[in-house]
């Protein structure tokens, strides 16, 4: 799942765009940013042997820390893995990644990216329009694995018609419409001088913030930017998140469909309309297409 697609902002952009390079399968250099060249999708049957081989080379458990839809659908475009490392340990991890026999070119931005040969690659396992090269991109994402599994969760393709991004946009839409407290004073463009609200954050979870317009450096009015100041402890456990959102349990957060069902049970009338309008207007939803259930 690409975080840029989740909230319509770009807090941790994982869809790394940059100049495509000719595939490099010799040498292992560390570069900054950019998607890996020469990679393609991996079949679900190839994921475990590919990661098992890389686990032996890195001395790390990888299979238990995959994120998003990996292993939940027949083909995955790449593999995202959470790594629980302190900031001071990342440089050594980068060196270890470069030295691993399987890794090809290694790139680093907010995550470590590499390509590896797919173990047990079967070129006959494919479908129309799918790129299969025998190599797959693996992104290593530093952070708390437990929380990242919650945030980057994607439902199994048999359980939902929609990607995990829709789930997160729905959570964000609900959060943005509950317990909003807006001050009476407004600035020239009509925005409130201060408001308190909940937001769905890729780093903090569900958290209540005080939102204020950002002052101009010269002191004359405000910019279009905003300043969010946390005023509560973050909520990261699924049951706690669901409770604060006015839903029943963490199971309601499983997919877009379960969230929509829970929303209709917990809210009525204008509140549902506001939440669904916010969801529909999200740029990622506009780009992918509004779900049939609410179109």
Where is each model-derived feature located?
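Short acidic, low-complexity intrinsically disordered linear motifs used
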Residues: 1-13
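Active-site nucleotide-donor binding segment shared across nucleotidyl transfer reactions
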Residues: 51-91
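Short secondary-structure junctions
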Residues: 57-67, 94-115, 180-189
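Well-ordered, non-membrane alpha-helical segments in soluble/globular domains
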Residues: 41-51, 91-97, 160-171
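Catalytic cores of NTP-dependent nucleotidyl/adenyl transfer enzymes across multiple folds
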Residues: 126-294
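Helical scaffold of the NTase/Pol beta-like nucleotidyltransferase catalytic core
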Residues: 10-67
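Conserved catalytic core of two-metal-ion nucleotidyltransferases
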Residues: 98-148
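Intrinsically disordered, low-complexity eukaryotic regions enriched in glycine, serine
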Residues: 53-57, 85, 106-113, 282, ...
């Amino acid at each position: 799942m690409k975080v840029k697609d989740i909230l319509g902002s770009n807090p941790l952009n994982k869809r790394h765009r940059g100049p495509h390079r000719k595939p490099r399968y010799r040498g292992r250099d560390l570069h900054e940013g950019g998607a890996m060249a020469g990679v393609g999708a991996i079949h679900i049957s190839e994921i475990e042997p590919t990661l098992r081989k890389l686990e032996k080379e890195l001395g790390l458990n990888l299979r238990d820390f995959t994120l998003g839809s990996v292993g939940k659908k027949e083909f995955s475009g790449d593999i995202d893995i959470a790594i629980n490392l302190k900031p001071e340990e990342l440089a050594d991890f980068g060196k270890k990644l470069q030295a691993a026999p399987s890794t090809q070119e290694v790139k680093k931005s907010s995550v470590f990216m590499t390509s590896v040969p797919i173990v047990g690659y079967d070129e006959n396992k494919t479908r129309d329009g799918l790129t299969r090269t025998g190599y797959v991109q693996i992104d290593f994402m530093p952070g708390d694995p437990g929380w990242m599994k919650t945030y980057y969760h994607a439902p199994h393709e048999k359980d939902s018609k929609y990607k995990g991004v829709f789930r997160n946009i729905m959570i964000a839409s609900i959060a943005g419409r509950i317990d909003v407290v807006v001050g009476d004073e407004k600035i020239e463009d009509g925005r409130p001088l201060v408001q308190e609200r909940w937001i769905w954050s890729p780093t903090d979870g569900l958290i209540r913030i005080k939102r204020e317009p950002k002052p101009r450096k010269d002191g004359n009015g405000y910019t279009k930017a905003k300043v969010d100041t946390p005023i509560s402890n973050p909520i990261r456990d699924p049951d706690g998140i669901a409770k604060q959102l006015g839903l029943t349990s963490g199971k309601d957060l499983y997919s877009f469909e379960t969230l929509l069902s829970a929303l209709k049970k917990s809210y009525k009338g204008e509140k549902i309309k506001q939440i669904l309008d916010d969801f529909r207007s999200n740029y990622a939803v506009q780009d992918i297409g509004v779900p049939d259930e609410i179109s």
